[in-house]
Amino acid sequence: MKLVAPFETSMDRSEIRRIILVEANVDGVIGWGECVAGESPFYSPEYTDTAWLVLRNFLWPLVKGQQFKAASDVWALLAQVRGHNMAKAALEAAVWDAEAKQKDMSLAKLIGGTREEIACGVSIGIKPSLDELVAAVKEELAAGYQRIKIKIKPGSDLEPVRRLRQEFPRIKLMVDANSAYTLEDWPLLKQLEGFYLMMIEQPLGWDDLYSHIELQKKLDTPICLDECIHTEEQARAAVELGACKIINIKLGRIGGYTVARRIHDLCQDHGVPVWCGGMLESGIGRAHNIALSTLPNFTLPGDVTATKRYWAEDIISPEVTVSPQGTIRVPVGPGIGLKPRLDLIEKFTVRKEHLV
């Protein structure tokens, strides 16, 4: 699927997304999941081609022919495979969607969600010029988004933030480095504190918890961890050792709803707010993100946005829209509450495999 506009981070630039969809038949009821792995292993060791192989060769054989009392039982089987959380999450999410449909209830309600609408922020990629960045922020604020996140990297950090604060002194603003810095860069990151940021997301190495602990000691601005958190155990270490004050929970990165709910509860018990990050999902993945964001400790605006921000044509109906107040209504229909557009899925499909 082709994005409406290219999206650039400190790691790479995306223009087209190859998306793996999982369609699971659970006792005659169809559930849908989406694998959020990217084209290349820059955000995560996983990427599209490896996820396909792991789903087909390892995860499917583990669940084939098994009887489950609930979707939450699937994780114990999938956990036998080390890593590959994005592939696991796609399969597990499809089973959760099917269970909610079997019970004729929304997925949000099934997982314990409490919200009828969720607060929305927006993530803006690195732009060629500051004027283009300002124009993009103006457009998103006019659309109603409650929080602005911009991507930063060395050489594109202080000046973009300074310019935005001059133009928009009162907006909720945060930055995301996607691991672009090292602990030696702490004086530069300290300078960002003068711009009253909500948080600095994943400033240091994707597997470097220790340096984040040391950095958070030096900063008053909260650190939010993303790439560092793949398991409940890593989340516990980050929270209890002081590596962060906020955690971004992504279904794909941590392996699905079962682990997401555990991390959510852990953070809630420790007074650590969470929010839902985005991975350039299609409407199916976005619907799952909406459901996840209804859990009570998702108290900060997430990266769940309107369909039209990324896709001229999406594969669900109705498309997701954002209110002028910067919120999305939670679907109340069974399962994810949005219907896959089978005609468009067929149109965009380049590879299909039927596993029985």
Task: Annotate each predicted stretch with a short phrase.
Residues M1-Y43, R309-E313:
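Structured beta-strand/loop patches that form or line metal/cofactor-binding pockets in enzymes
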Residues N25, I30-Q102:
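Metal- or metallocofactor-binding catalytic centers and their adjacent structured scaffolds
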Residues Y196, D207-C224, I229-T327:
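Shared catalytic-loop signature of beta/alpha-barrel
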Residues V22, G28, L59, L91, ...:
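Conserved, mostly hydrophobic/aromatic
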Residues G33, C120-I124, I148-I150, L173-A177, ...:
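Hydrophobic faces of well-ordered beta-strands that scaffold small-molecule active sites
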Residues R309, I315-V356:
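C-terminal extensions of enzymes
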